[in-house]
Curated annotation (Swiss-Prot):
GO terms for molecular function: beta-aspartyl-peptidase activity; hydrolase activity, acting on carbon-nitrogen (but not peptide) bonds, in linear amides. This is Probable isoaspartyl peptidase/L-asparaginase 3. Heterotetramer of two alpha and two beta chains arranged as a dimer of alpha/beta heterodimers. The active site is at T224. Substrate binds at R252, V253, G254, D255, T275, G276, D277, G278.
Length: 359
């Protein structure tokens, strides 16, 4: 055999072996992917995301479909329209979507008159160079890009809840150090509560008569859906949607649209979703912490527990949870102050499975 023929044969053999290796790698990938992980037992939302990604949709597209299904179903009254009235009785929407490949993010906050939060966030990602739009500006953008609106986001249930709250002297609420303390506003600062007294004998400072209120957080007034999807190619995306805290002060933005707090994703590492007391959690960016801890070698469970413990050390009355998934599809959750459940579907499961995490 001529030298040139030998070279051609060897080159062909090497090419065949490389293609075989790629095919084997893709086969292995398809065995463990896709994966859908979501906070809480939002089964229909996970099924919607699974149908999309199992039929070839990208991770971003599947996240949008899953969170959108939860919005349409008004999951627990805390996602989508018709729930969580603020002090004025109005429902507003927070949402976020993040692509772990490009690190692009689209988000909307305190969005009025448009019910499709996750689709609005996706439009921000696709058709603007911004990361976050808020308030009526977010609404106008979403409507201009084709989403239905403006519309009233209240429901008979949310109106009734708000009316009952008003009859109960607007209690409980998220105000502090104001007068009146036990009735509806208008509110003014309680300056006497902000006086600082210095104890000369101990050199310590004490706040005079500052009112303490336990956190107004529970599974039915802070239920964010936060979802992570790994598609058939191993790419990851995350998304969140919520109508926020019930009886919040108008204009309040929770952690739902804050990247790194409610959700975070990086194709090189994995993703995270969070739920709970967003006003506290956004101060710690727990999902960014989870992903970075996994980058440093922590397993999902260890990373999730570490992120939650960082918050609990500073705020022992905090209530919240995170769910972590690494780039291989391994998942775990951690929580504090409540029992947490999260949902998963992958190729090894016939249907969605719910995992329970104890505090």
């Amino acid at each position: 055999m001529a030298r040139s023929d030998v070279l051609i044969f060897v080159s062909t053999l090497l090419l065949f072996l490389s293609l075989l290796t790629v095919a084997d790698a893709e086969l292995v990938k398809s065995d463990k992917f896709p994966v859908v992980v979501s906070t809480w037992p939002f089964l229909e939302a996970v099924r919607a995301a699974w149908r999309a990604v199992d039929n070839g949709s990208s991770a971003v597209e599947a996240v949008v479909e899953g969170c959108s299904a939860c919005e349409e179903l008004r999951c627990d009254g805390t996602v989508g329209p018709g729930g969580s009235p603020d002090e004025n009785g109005e429902t507003m929407i927070d949402a976020l979507v993040m692509d772990g490949v490009t690190m692009e993010v689209g988000a909307v906050a305190a969005m009025r008159y448009v019910k499709d939060g996750i689709r609005a966030a996706h439009l921000v990602m696709k058709y603007s160079q911004h990361t976050l739009l808020a308030g009526e500006g977010a609404s106008a953008f979403a409507i201009s890009m084709g989403l239905p609106g403006p519309m009233n986001l209240s429901s008979p249930e949310s109106v009734k809840k708000w009316s009952d709250w008003k009859e109960n002297q607007c209690q409980p609420n998220f105000r502090k150090n104001v007068v009146p303390a036990n009735d509806c506003g208008p509110y003014k600062p309680n300056n006497s509560a902000m006086n600082v007294f210095v104890d000369k004998s101990t050199e310590s400072c004490e706040m005079g008569a500052i009112e303490y209120k336990p956190p107004l957080v529970g599974p039915h007034n802070h239920d964010t859906i936060s979802m992570a999807v790994i598609d058939r190619m191993g790419h990851i995306a995350v998304g969140t949607s919520t109508n926020g805290a019930t009886y919040k002060i108008p204009g309040r933005v929770g952690d739902g649209p804050i990247v790194g707090s409610s959700a975070y994703a990086d194709d090189e590492v994995g993703g995270c979703g969070a739920t709970g007391d967003g006003d506290t959690m956004m101060r710690f960016l727990p999902c960014y912490q989870v992903v970075e801890s996994m980058r440093q070698g922590m397993k999902p469970e260890e990373a999730a527990k570490d992120a939650i413990s960082r918050i609990a050390r500073k705020f022992p009355d905090f209530v919240g949870a995170v769910v972590a998934v690494d780039k291989n599809g391994s998942h775990a959750g951690a929580c504090y102050g409540w029992t947490f459940q999260y949902s998963v579907q992958n190729p090894d499961m016939n249907d969605v499975q719910v995992f329970t995490v104890l505090p």
